Structure formats: C-alpha cells, structure tokens
Amino acid sequence: MKKDELRYLQRLAEIYPTIGKASTEIINLQSILNLPKGTEHFMSDLHGEYQAFSHVLRNGSGAVRKKIDDVFGHTLSNNDKRSLATLIYYPKEKMDLVKDTEEDMENWYKITLYRLIEICKTTASKYTRSKVRKALPADYAYVIEELITEKAEVLDKEAYYDSIVNTIIEIGSAENFIIALAELIQRLVVDHLHILGDIYDRGPAPHFIMDRLMQYHSLDIQWGNHDVVWMGAAAGQKACIATVVRNSIRYGNLDILEDGYGINMLPLATFVMEAYKDDPCEIFAMKGAFNYNVLEEELGKKMHKAIAVIQFKLEGKLVRRHKEFQMEDRALLHRINPEKGTITLPDGKEYPLRDNNFPTIDWKHPYELTAGEKEVMDKLSSAFRNCEKLQNHIRLLLDKGGLYTVYNGNLLFHGSIPLNEDGTFREVQIYGKSYKGKELYDVLETYVRRAFYSVGKEEQKKGRDIMWYIWAAPNSPLFGKSKMSTFERYFIEDPSTHEEKKNAYYRLWENEEVVDNMLREFGLDPEKGHIINGHVPVHQSEGESPVKCDGKVIVIDGGFSKPYQKVTGIAGYTLIYNSYGLNLTAHEPFTSKAD
C-alpha cells in the first residue's frame, strides 16, 4: 500500500472508527447519489448591477416558474402562475399589492399557504431530510417540517394539515409564514450557485452583491479580471488602486468607495483643486446620466484626469521593473512630445493628443509621482488595506473563489485559456519560469494567494504585482487581448489605436479537437464535459449564439452591464444545470421590482 493511501485510510479511520459508522456513511452517500440532481445556477459578469442580480437570484433563472409548472400543470391559469411566481420572488411587496385589491384576505392566505406548501414539498423532495432541515428558517422550522413531511402515523392527514394552516392564520402569522416559505423555495430551488467572475466593474453596487453572496448557502466564484484588480487594490497594489478609483470616477460610482467602503476621496479632491485648477479636463467627463451639479462635474473631471495620469505613471514603472511581463509597450508617457502635442506609439506611428496638458509630469522623469500624487496614493493605499468591509469581501473571493473550478464534470472560468494560433497551449513567462495550460492557472492563483497569506515580504510583493498582470496582460487568462488600450482611448482620436485583438481562444472555440484538448488538460472527459465561461458579451442582435462547438462550450456573459445591452440586444444569459440537463436562459433588461 502506498504511503498516501495509508494516510487517507488513517484519516478515514479517525472520522469513522467503527464498521457501523463507516457502513452508515456509505449507505447515506449512496442514497444521496440516487436522489435527483440538485440544481446548479450559473451567473457571470454581474458588473455591480445588484438589482438585476438580485432579481435573477430570486427567480433562479426561471427555475421557480418551472417548479410551479411541475407542481400545478394545467390546474392553475397562467395569470395565477405568474402571480404565484411574483409572490415567491418578492413576498412582502406582492402581499402589499394583494391587500389593496383582495376582499377576503383570510381565504387568500389559506389558498396561498397550501400552494406554497405543495411547491416546498416538491423542491425538498430531491434532498435528504438532514439537508432540508438545515435550510429551514429557525423561527418556523418545526411547523414547516410538519407540513412538508408525510406522516404515516396520522390517519386523517387533511384535518391535521388544515388545523396547522388555520392556526397560522388565526394567530396573525400568515404573512410572516408566507415570507418564510417563499424564501425557503428560493433557497431549495437552487442547490449551488456558480459566479463566473466580474462581480465588480462599472455598476453602482458590487458591495451589495458581495454582502448577498456572503449569506448564500452554497457557492463558488471564478475570479474575473475586474475582481482581481479589486483584490490587488485591497492588498495595497497602487496601480490596481489607481485603476479601481479611475473606473469608479469614470462611471460616476464614487459612492461605492465613499459610502460602500468608507474610503475617503477628499485627499484626491483636495490635490486636484490645486494641481489641475487651470485645466478644464474636457475629455475626462464621466459616463452615464448623473444628478451632479456643475461644480461636482468639474471636480469629477479633474479627479478623473488626475488619477488616470497617476495610473499611467504607476503602470509605466511596473512594466519597466518587471521586464518578464513583456508589457513595456504599455509604458507610454515617455513617448509623448509635449512641444508638438503628439505621441509616437511603439509601432512608430505618431498621433496628435486630444489633451496635451500634463501639469504633474516631469518630462525628464515622466513616471515619477509628484509629492502631492505620492501623498494621495499613500492615503488611498492605507484606506484600501484597512477597510474591514472590503477585506471581508476579498476574503470571500479567496475562500470561495479561484481562477477556475472543475465541478460535476464541467470546467468553469471567466476569460480564456491562452492559446497559440495552432490551438496548442501558449507558454507564458511568470517570474522567470514558463507555464502553460492548467499549470499557468495554478501558478497565477498561487501568487495571488501569496499576496494575502505569505509571510515573506518579497513573495507578497510578487503576488500583489501579479494581480495587476492578471488584470491587464495579453497572456493573462482573464484578459486575453493584445493590449489594454486605456491610454489610447483617452488621448488618441484614431479608433484603430483602440483595437484590442482577442486571444486565439475566441477564434478556436468551435474547433472540437482544440476544445477536447482543453478539457483533457483539466482532467475532464471530452465526451461528457463542457467549458462554461463568461467575460465576452454574446451579440444576439447580430445572430451570435452562446453555444459553441456543438454544445461543448457555453458562453454566459450575464449582460448585467447596461451599456452592453445596447450592443448585445439582450441582458445576457444565465445557465441552469439540473436533473433534466443544461438549460440556457436569455434575459430581458431588468428595469425595476415594480415592473
């Protein structure tokens, strides 16, 4: 017997010290395998859109409505089914509406309770009693268990259940009980949640999404590039901090930082009022419709430009320090000719700048922060590192997340696997060593975790810097484009300079041989496995399908980000995997709970 096998057996002997206990566990596990498969729910690219995320989470991407159809078939009208589904999604709000129109609330309570009990029975039937018991709300656990469990010893079951329901109504607990049942159905309908990245980005409330996920009963997270840049910021990586702040200002979401995480923007605001007082910063207007007055808009533009310039300085120093990143083409400030107001890009072409006012750049040392910029970044770094709420949210990403997940025979990740044009795995240099395929994912994730857990300062620093690399590098599995053209989009009019060419993965995901090789690389059976990933919006309005390679690759960019919805034509896709198989759901843009 091998040493490892013996070690596992010794550990099992500690957990199950007798034949009886081991036998009981084997019987229990085998019985669970014979139950219907628990429903998995896949969501991706939430982009801070909490309201839309919450709605999809409540309805389980149609799983709740499907369960209503299973239970009631043709015995309920479509209107009644819709009304019941809405009640399960938003029980309190729906009951407030019903009370305005319903004349006999007692009768409505009774009918509704019985309907919810029937749905609870069906949703609970695919789980063990132990698992259902753990899901029950503490205040009503005993009563709900009585109502959804068949009691063979009770001869007159109808009278028994009637007495319980009538008592619930008589003592004035009907509304609270309905809310408890609705929330239980929401929980039981989805057994496990997969979030395939980009919880953070341009939307207004990623912190609310993280709060909700911290309470969720069973989930895993595949980090997106926007998640990793926030993780880098939380670890104190200054280029990541500047990126996060710039994105928040650009999309008018400083509330995330100031109200959501208590990160003070006053040092930056104070700095720009002096350093950029004579600069109108016209090309740095915020995107979207905001209720800002003229003074707030002017201040926002100055803050936007100031943090963008700081970001470009920090990134320039970073790529020059890490030659192995092979990203020196992203150091652009030294290529500016301030007298001519032009820039010569790495390809040798010269372009006029849309804005040639750089009051904080010393052209002899263009990547050095001024004393004022350094003070701003030191204060921001301290604020990010010492924000307890942010650190708790990042801890959830570390505890429940990773760069990829293998689950129930499927490979889940956010972006793309770096490939050569011939479909072979691209070798990528990470701190002096070459990695490819699964090994590349594993080493990058190891470095990310070292940023938070390593006791060595040098390893921590490498981990912090690798998070910026994962955010922006062409060879990063989470970015996967030729360059991140942030500078060009701000300062150069010519759209050809804005192009970000995608990794070969996106040109080869219809090639079955390449897809099979990727599945095998991660230990999966190509005949049964699937690749499920997000990151790239599916342009349904142009006829694009989210299903690639005869169903072996499924793209579920959630499309929660409102700007993308104008391009894609829908609010993206989510995926359900249950005992019936894989089911894609296309979503209409979410407007409001009232609608």
Predicted regions and their residues:
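Feature recognizes metal-dependent phosphohydrolase scaffolds
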Residues: 1-595
